[in-house]
Structure formats: structure tokens, C-alpha cells
């Protein structure tokens, strides 16, 4: 109790009140923000949410410590596992004894606790604290005291200096606690120590600049050293310019391999979008149904829910309906795919009508497998740009519950189900008298909704079989919808993409274990 109060007092003195010091997994914690929007990403008691060689990293008395007691042959890192960073502010306190360290951001995980990318440098010596260094890349990009613009081909333009390196070094406390702050907005990167701007970089070099990536701490190769971090606080920033951010929330594995491949599907969408509109749309994939990152939603422009639904839908657990409803009222776009369009009428139904204009309602909607026939696409809607009518066998739910009146819900994809799909026995998902009486009726399988708050909603009932993403028309329809839902203009010919057989299968969930025969037990 004394320790917790001590840490809170320290934070209060910095006007950064936070309190996530419980020994729990981050997924079970509600983010605690101060009035400036900072969120703690270190619980003060464990390495939960971080990955590194535990031989070198530990937690003591609320402090994250990296230490080597003998010469280290290769530089190693402690990597934040709960998300990636794009536009953000990071603030923390650090103390370093001997050697060199740094904060990696928007970086690449090379495996084996190795990292490449931007680094906010720190050291026990007099030369490098505050500089921008690119690990396993361009080396020193901006020295302390410099304002630089990095042009194509590595050409460097030096602007008006901030101050001399020596004067700025005098602001840093050697062997004591210092406050480091990183501000990254688009290609504009700033490093502050103890409130003093140390370096400022505008990175315009095509192919080198990075818009998002991992966050990590460094233990440098060489002499024994010790670096300590505490009060690690992250704040997401809304993306600058015309850029948008899409979160792809993939549910847990639930079916045999090849079906309900939520993770593989989201990763495939991410690759296609990165290849086609990566300069304007930043994507982040979160697995297991919901982000572990307590800051994930803070700068999102749109969200895809691709998961199992019904009573197990991730969005109806805990207080998440209220959380997403607040985002929707802010104008965040929401898209739902396949089973993700189903929620209980009494818990989520009203919200889905408000968010995306419709949902799968049990004892009203049905879930047969069938091949599209007599397909029609909406005319003059951006989601249908470059898409031609297609035939795909899938679990196409139909007879959705839509807003009333539904004039503001656009029918994106419609088809006429075989009469045989209306002849199944009645059940929660299988059939009902209304469906049975509508033989030959055209049904809505994908729809779009423009909300009064300015946000956009989209729903599609297909997506059961992962192999169907090999169909260029179906895949383009979904990619177009994700771009549109994010608030970005869809190209006239749609989002072009190519998916190889390898890309289609490389991220599949492993086959589930065989079911035990109860009679044999």
C-alpha cells in the first residue's frame, strides 16, 4: 500500500495521474487516463504485456529494470506486446548507469529480441541522449540540438538549430531520474528530455520513413550496464492530414481449419490494404476478440468486428457496448462481418441498428449455406466500385433485421436464395414462418448505413469460408467497404489486390484437437 501511494504521489507531482498497478493481465483492466489522455502501459509489478529475455529484464519496487552483469555480445530488447504505435506521445522516467540504451518506436520486430527502426537514444555519456537514431538502418538521423528534414535518397536539410548539444546536455541529470517524452505526428518526430526539445526530425525519405510499428526498450551490447524505467505513459494522437486508422478485431478460433478464420482473414485484409492504400489508411490487427492495448481505440477512425457472435460476441461482454457506442457517437465507422453481425436482440440489437443499420436477429434471420444466384450490386455506391456480380458458396445469412424505416440503409449486395433454404425446420437460426412465406424473395446480404453523427456502418453476412477471399470480386467488395467505413474515398476501380495461394493459407489457425469420444471415457 505504501508503494502504491508513493507512486501515485510521484505521478501527481507530474500532473499525470494514473493507477493501473494491479497484478492482472492488461485485457482485464480498464484503462485509467488522466485529463491529458495518457494511459499507463506498465503495471508496476510484472512484465505482463512485455516480451524480452528474462535473464536481463525484471521489475522491482515499481521499476522496470534492464541489466547486464557481464559483457553482452548482442543488443537485446524488451518489446511491448499489446499493440503498435503510430501517431502518439510517450512519456516516461528513466535512469541509466553505464552504457547506452534507447526507446524504439514505429519499429520492426526481427525476432530473437532484435529490433530495427526509430530510436530515441539515451546514454550515461555526454553525446547521444535525445538524438534520433535508426537501429539497423540509417544510423544517426538527427543529432541533439538539430532540426533536420530527411529528403529522398537520404539528403539531409539542416534547419535552425534548437541549441548547442552541450547546453542541452546540461539539462540532463547524469545517473539520476530524467523524464523522456516522444511526440510522433505523421513524419514529424520530436524528442524531449526534462521538458527540453533535444531533436526534431521531419522524415520524408520514401521507403525509409515508418508510420507505425512496435515499441521497445534497448539493452546495448558491450560493457555491463543498467537502465531503469517507470511511469510509462502512452497517449494516442489522431492521425494528421487525410490519413485514417482502421482496427481489425479478429475473434478466437472456433471452427475447423478453413472456416471462421477471423485472424487469417484480418491479416489478409491488412496486407491488401497496406499494398493498395497504405499511405492513407493505417491498419492494426488485434486477435482473441478484443485488444489488450488499453489505448487501441483512442485514435481509431473505424473498427471491423470479425468474430463469433450471439451470446459470445466480444462486443457485448463487460462494458464494451457502452465503449463502442461512445466511439460511434464520435463518428467512428463500424463494420461487421459474417457471424459478427449477430447479437442478442435484447443486448446489442438496438446498438447495432444505430451503428450499422441492421443485425442478425434469432427467430427472424436464418443462416443457410448456399451459392449466390441472381446477384445484384448497388448502383453508384463507392463500396461497389470495380466490383462485378459474383457467385460464391458460403453461409449467407439473410432476412436481417433492419432499421425502420430503412430508407437510409443501402442494399449493397442482394441475391435470391434457393427455395430449399426456406424449407428447413423452424429454429433460432434455421427457419421461421416469415422466411418460409417469402420464397423467391430477393434478400439483402450486405448493406451500408450513413449515421446522423457522420459515422458509417457496414454489414455483410458472408465470410464463413476463408478460401472465398480468393474470389476477386468478393474480396474487393469487402476491401472497398473497409475503406469507405474508414472515411476514405474508394478509387473508381475499387481497391485492387492480389492474393497468392501461399498468402491465403499462411496464417490459418491450427486444426483443433480431435474431440474426445464421451462413450469411451
Where in this protein do the model-derived segments appear?
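Extracellular ligand-binding/catalytic regions of CAZymes and related secreted enzymes
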Residues: 241-243, 250, 268, 421, ...
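Solvent-exposed loop/turn segments at secondary-structure junctions
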Residues: 71-72, 95-99, 110-111, 125-128, ...
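Helical hinge/lid and interdomain linker segments adjacent to catalytic or ligand-binding clefts
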Residues: 248-249, 254-343
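Bacterial N-terminal signal peptides that target proteins for export
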Residues: 1-11, 18-22
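Structural recognition of the beta-strand scaffold that forms the well-ordered cores
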Residues: 65, 104, 119-122, 245-250, ...
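Carbohydrate-interacting regions of secretory-pathway proteins
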Residues: 24-241, 353, 358-361, 366, ...
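Catalytic beta-strand/loop cores that center a nucleophilic Ser/Cys/Thr
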Residues: 361-362, 366-453
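A glycine-rich, often tryptophan-bearing local segment used as a flexible ligand/cofactor-contacting loop or short
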Residues: 310-389
Amino acid at each position: 500500500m505504501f508503494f502504491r501511494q508513493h507512486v501515485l504521489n510521484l505521478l501527481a507531482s507530474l500532473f499525470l495521474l494514473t493507477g493501473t498497478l494491479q497484478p492482472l493481465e492488461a485485457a482485464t483492466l480498464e484503462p485509467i487516463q488522466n485529463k491529458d489522455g495518457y494511459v499507463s502501459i506498465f503495471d508496476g509489478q510484472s512484465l505482463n504485456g512485455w516480451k524480452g529475455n528474462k535473464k536481463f529484464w525484471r521489475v522491482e519496487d515499481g521499476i522496470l529494470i534492464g541489466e547486464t552483469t557481464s559483457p553482452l555480445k548482442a543488443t537485446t530488447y524488451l518489446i511491448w506486446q499489446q499493440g503498435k504505435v503510430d501517431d502518439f506521445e510517450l512519456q516516461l522516467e528513466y535512469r541509466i548507469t553505464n552504457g547506452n540504451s534507447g526507446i524504439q518506436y514505429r519499429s520492426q520486430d526481427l525476432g530473437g529480441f532484435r529490433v530495427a527502426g526509430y530510436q530515441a537514444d539515451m546514454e550515461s555519456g555526454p553525446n547521444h541522449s535525445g538524438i534520433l537514431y535508426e537501429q539497423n538502418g540509417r544510423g544517426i538521423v538527427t543529432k541533439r540540438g538539430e532540426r533536420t528534414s530527411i529528403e529522398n535518397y537520404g539528403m539531409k536539410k539542416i534547419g535552425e538549430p534548437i541549441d548547442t548539444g552541450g547546453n542541452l546536455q546540461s539539462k540532463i541529470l547524469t545517473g539520476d531520474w530524467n523524464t523522456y517524452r516522444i511526440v510522433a505526428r505523421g513524419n514529424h518526430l520530436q524528442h524531449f528530455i526534462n521538458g527540453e526539445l533535444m531533436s526534431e526530425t521531419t522524415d520524408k525519405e520514401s521507403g525509409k520513413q515508418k508510420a507505425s510499428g512496435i515499441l521497445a526498450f534497448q539493452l546495448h551490447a558491450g560493457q555491463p550496464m543498467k537502465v531503469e524505467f517507470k511511469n510509462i505513459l502512452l497517449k494516442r494522437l489522431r492521425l494528421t492530414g487525410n490519413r485514417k486508422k482502421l482496427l481489425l478485431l479478429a475473434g478466437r478460433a472456433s471452427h475447423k481449419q478453413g472456416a471462421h478464420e477471423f485472424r487469417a482473414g484480418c491479416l489478409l485484409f491488412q496486407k491488401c490494404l497496406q499494398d493498395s492504400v497504405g499511405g492513407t489508411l493505417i491498419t492494426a490487427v488485434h486477435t482473441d476478440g478484443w485488444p489488450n492495448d488499453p489505448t487501441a481505440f483512442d485514435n481509431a477512425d473505424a473498427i471491423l468486428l470479425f468474430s463469433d457472435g450471439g451470446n459470445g460476441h466480444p462486443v457485448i461482454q463487460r462494458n464494451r457496448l457502452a465503449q463502442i457506442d461512445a466511439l460511434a457517437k464520435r463518428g467512428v465507422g463500424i463494420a461487421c462481418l459474417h457471424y459478427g453481425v449477430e447479437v442478442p436482440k435484447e443486448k446489442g440489437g438496438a446498438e447495432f441498428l444505430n451503428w450499422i443499420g441492421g443485425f442478425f436477429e434469432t427467430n427472424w434471420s436464418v443462416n443457410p449455406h448456399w451459392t449466390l444466384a441472381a446477384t445484384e450490386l448497388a448502383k453508384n455506391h463507392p463500396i461497389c466500385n470495380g466490383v462485378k456480380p459474383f457467385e460464391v458458396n458460403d453461409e449467407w445469412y439473410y432476412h436481417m433485421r433492419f432499421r425502420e424505416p430503412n430508407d437510409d440503409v443501402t442494399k449493397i449486395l442482394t441475391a435470391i436464395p434457393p427455395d430449399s433454404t426456406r424449407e428447413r425446420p423452424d429454429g433460432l437460426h434455421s427457419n421461421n414462418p416469415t422466411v418460409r412465406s417469402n420464397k423467391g424473395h430477393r434478400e439483402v446480404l450486405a448493406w451500408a448505413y450513413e449515421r446522423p453523427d457522420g459515422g458509417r456502418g457496414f454489414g455483410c453476412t458472408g465470410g464463413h469460408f476463408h478460401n472465398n477471399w480468393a474470389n476477386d470480386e468478393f474480396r474487393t467488395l469487402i476491401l472497398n467497404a473497409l475503406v469507405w467505413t474508414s472515411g476514405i474515398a474508394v478509387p473508381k476501380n475499387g481497391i485492387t489486390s492480389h492474393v497468392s495461394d501461399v498468402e491465403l493459407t499462411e496464417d490459418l489457425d491450427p486444426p483443433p484437437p480431435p474431440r474426445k469420444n464421451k462413450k469411451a471415457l
